[in-house]
């Protein structure tokens, strides 16, 4: 039984009104896939392809128009946000706008614990310190205001906030790809380490195919709301079956990859 099962997930938006009524378009159109435990699924595609809309439905931020999302074989209801938040958390793309700038880090991390648990303040503080340590931050960071942190530190806090309820799935919405190379490598290694230690499954949305080649077990390619390809990085990057995938690979790597690109990775490890 897969950890997450998405069946025919669809999101329809209403467009501008016209003489013939209000136009509708499917931002996501009957997308289906599964995610296994301790696996990473990447979602790629051009801007406007439906990637972010898809993961927002999975995270419970927006309701689907139709289709089902099953976690451990139990259907998730959009209205049951509190239950979903314990299992599926999201790290957003822009760390600068992801937090209330008036809060310190302790308050930011305490909020999900206060909402989702009946723990005492002492228990919550212990969990906050433990989670900060997991992402490489010291306990005394709890008293720092979020606005005084670097972008790398903010992303670590965002990851800590996602981790603190011990979810099985974390969605990362392009939160690594836009960072400087050295910071990106640090956070990439951190997420992989946490996956090994805690058994987390990731859904990674992004444009950095170099990162995706390194971390993903499977990839979904989106175009105009539809899933047009699904497979391993090696299959998709060496033998793309659609023009969209081919252009994405060639745009990033400068060419379609061959098998030697993975031999180099194995030797590096």
UniProtKB/Swiss-Prot annotation:
What GO annotations for molecular function exist for this entry?
ATP binding; ATP hydrolysis activity
What topology in the membrane does the UniProt record assign? Peripheral membrane protein
Mention one GO biological process in which this protein takes part, according to its record.
Answer: transmembrane transport
- Can you tell me which residues bind ATP? 45-52
| GO cellular component annotations of the record | plasma membrane
Q: Which PROSITE patterns match?
A: ABC_TRANSPORTER_2
Residues of the ABC transporter domain: 4-249
Under SUPFAM superfamilies, the record lists: P-loop containing nucleoside triphosphate hydrolases
Q: Which Gene3D superfamilies match?
A: P-loop containing nucleotide triphosphate hydrolases
**Domain of life from the UniProt record:** Bacteria
Q: Where in the cell is it found?
A: Cell inner membrane
What are the protein's UniProt keywords?
A: ATP-binding, Cell inner membrane, Cell membrane, Membrane, Nucleotide-binding, Peptide transport, Protein transport, Transport
State the protein's purpose.
Answer: Involved in a peptide intake transport system that plays a role in the resistance to antimicrobial peptides.
Membership in a protein family: Belongs to the ABC transporter superfamily.
Q: What is this protein called?
A: Peptide transport system ATP-binding protein SapF
Species annotation = Haemophilus influenzae (strain ATCC 51907 / DSM 11121 / KW20 / Rd)
């Amino acid at each position: 039984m897969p950890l997450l099962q998405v069946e025919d997930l669809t999101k329809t938006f209403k467009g501008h009104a016209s003489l013939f009524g209000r136009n509708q378009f499917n931002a996501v159109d009957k997308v289906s896939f599964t995610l296994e435990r301790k696996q990473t699924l990447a979602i790629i595609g051009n801007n406007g392809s439906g990637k972010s809309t898809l993961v927002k439905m999975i995270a419970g931020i927006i309701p689907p128009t139709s289709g089902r999302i099953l976690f451990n074989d139990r259907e998730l209801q959009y209205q049951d946000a509190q239950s979903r938040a314990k299992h599926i958390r999201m790290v957003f793309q822009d760390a600068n706008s992801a937090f209330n700038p008036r809060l310190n880090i302790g308050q930011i991390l305490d909020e999900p614990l206060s909402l989702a648990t009946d723990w005492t303040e002492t228990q919550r503080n212990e969990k906050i310190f433990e989670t900060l340590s997991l992402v490489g931050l010291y306990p005394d960071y709890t008293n720092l205001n979020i606005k005084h942190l670097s972008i790398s530190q903010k992303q670590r806090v965002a990851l800590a906030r996602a981790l603190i309820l011990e979810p099985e799935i974390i969605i990362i919405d392009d939160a690594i790809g836009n960072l400087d190379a050295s910071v990106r490598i640090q956070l990439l290694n951190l997420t992989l380490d946490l996956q090994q230690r805690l058994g987390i499954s990731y859904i990674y949305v992004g444009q950095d195919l170099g990162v995706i080649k390194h971390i993903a077990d499977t990839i979904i390619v989106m175009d105009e709301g539809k899933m047009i390809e699904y497979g391993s990085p090696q299959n998709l990057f060496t033998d793309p079956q659609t023009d969209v995938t081919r252009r994405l690979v060639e745009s990033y790597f400068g060419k379609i990859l061959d098998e030697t690109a993975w031999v180099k990775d194995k030797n590096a490890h």
